């Protein structure tokens, strides 16, 4: 049986909030089977829980937020959510003593290291996947994203940025997803932004944690970070990282093919909601026999060591 996963032990880290620029303490806790992914703000009294849910997602200019029925929000969840998807973590409680998850280095890699440090435990309960049965597509002007049936999880993402720092040959990235491929090829890709936007936001008291330490920063011509890029195509790899996190907001790894053109958080979420709203387009599946599981989701030894 393919089993649900949680953490072996509690781990903690500190980082800076993208919005406030203040120190944030992040605590990751194991959770029982069928808990799902729960984000929790402990700076509120009593603490407020935000279960990962496609319907709770709001896309703001700076990040992805989860918002509850009282309009309370937790911000900057997308990169940690991508790390959970990458390692197939089904059950976890994520606590922060702030309104936001720390931005760390702007990628998912610090969260991957933290999760691996906690260790990953299998629970004696079948892991539920969402399997795509019919093609579903959403559009917004010339942007689009779609899911097709496929026995695995593949992603094919194209961006179209007209910028000298982004070579036209580095605007598409495609991969067959696996925990190993996610860790090596995607998790280290950082978010990016324009220097002028960061300066403008900071002049208005926003994005106070934004810096060269947590993003690729560009002007109109070039990358301004001293160390340059981690990958030649880091921009499109990061957009794929975002998509992996966005699509895991249903709380389950997805079996299907994802293809997108110029998509972002809002359109990724619109696609996920469109799939879930169309009952005949998907189904929950479990795997009693390991041999039936798509190769994509076989855990590498590093994950379950």
Swiss-Prot record:
Sites where the protein binds Zn(2+): 79, 238, 242
Xref: Gene3D superfamilies: lpxc deacetylase, domain 1 (3.30.230.20), lpxc deacetylase, domain 2 (3.30.1700.10)
Signal recorded as keyword: no
UniProt catalytic activity: a UDP-3-O-[(3R)-3-hydroxyacyl]-N-acetyl-alpha-D-glucosamine + H2O = a UDP-3-O-[(3R)-3-hydroxyacyl]-alpha-D-glucosamine + acetate
EC assignment: 3.5.1.108
Swiss-Prot/TrEMBL cofactor(s): Zn(2+)
InterPro entries for the chain: Ribosomal_Su5_D2-typ_SF, UDP-acyl_GlcNac_deAcase, UDP-acyl_GlcNac_deAcase_C, UDP-acyl_N-AcGlcN_deAcase_N
Catalytic residues, chain numbering: 265 (proton donor)
Pathway this chain belongs to: Glycolipid biosynthesis; lipid IV(A) biosynthesis; lipid IV(A) from (3R)-3-hydroxytetradecanoyl-[acyl-carrier-protein] and UDP-N-acetyl-alpha-D-glucosamine: step 2/6
NCBIfam families per the UniProt record, alphabetical: lpxC
Name recorded for this polypeptide: UDP-3-O-acyl-N-acetylglucosamine deacetylase
